[in-house]
Amino acid sequence: MRALVIVDPGPASPPPETLPALLEAMAAWRDRWRSQMEMFEFFAGRGGGWGVFNVDDIGLSQAMMEFPFSPFSTIAVHPTVDGDDALSRFTQTTKEMLAQMGGG
């Protein structure tokens, strides 16, 4: 499964004295999940970032549970499908629905 994961800063920031340890943990987390991430990006000029995972549901859940900044973040997970395949399927489904409604 491919999924876009968007991480934004949450309502509570980590205590400043915890940042060095959190950043070390973040680097280790990235190394652990690197092979299953197609993209790994930070937002320019603000907190947060995004990544594209290619992993099964259990693996994605595990990665998010292990994410060091999760207590201080809002995380959105969006499963994705191939765009060309989705467009083709949506076009076909729309044609079928319109035909059933007498409009196609």
Model-derived regions: residue spans:
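Conserved, structured core segments of small domains
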Residues: 1-104
